[in-house]
């Protein structure tokens, strides 16, 4: 059976990439502190020796919108196009092409039915910075297959917090029941230092707490 090699909660702050790669006067004063914190997370993931990354994030209205927003969605594709035009323009993020792990996706979708989750799926999912930024920060080689799981945190009605807790427990159980001799790292992503839709949305904020 598969093993949960690590569980990590990490930022998907879209400004990290530009801040960490800037030099001279363009480099913000908090960049070095930010890089040091991210390096510690990266070392944790490297020590775990994962074979697969199970990425739990959210779509920022790139592919899913107010009129079509599943509460919980699993990507089920052999490959994923990653990052959108506005993310390249606004944040300087590179376009990525990431390999999927379809066997684990299928196992989660089938097994989810027995754990109280009728999970939506997409065979044509294109992912955004909620998945790519943690890969850039924690696994910049981008060499591991992924399973993206999108959660609805934007379009009311939102799931209750208890459902997110239950989903986390279900994902762990499903990974551990997957009949594959592989190590899976589960990475939950988000950030606390931006005010989405508010006056501080694009302010000069540093590292997440």
Q: Regions from the language model: what does each represent?
A:
Residues 62, 155, 195:
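Flexible, glycine-rich phosphate/dinucleotide-binding loops
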Residues 159-208:
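Active-site beta-strand/loop microenvironment that shapes enzyme catalytic pockets
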Residues 1-111, 115, 119:
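A short aromatic-anchored loop/beta-hairpin motif
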Residues 51-57, 149, 182-190:
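Beta-strand elements within well-structured catalytic alpha/beta cores of enzymes
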Residues 105-147, 194-209:
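Catalytic cores of processing enzymes, dominated by hydrolases/peptidases
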Residues 123-179:
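Glycine-rich phosphate- or other oxyanion-binding loops that anchor nucleotides, phosphorylated ligands
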Residues 4, 143, 181-183:
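A generic structural signal for alpha->beta connector loops
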Residues 11-16, 152-154, 192:
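Short connector loops/turns at beta-strand edges and beta->alpha or beta->beta junctions
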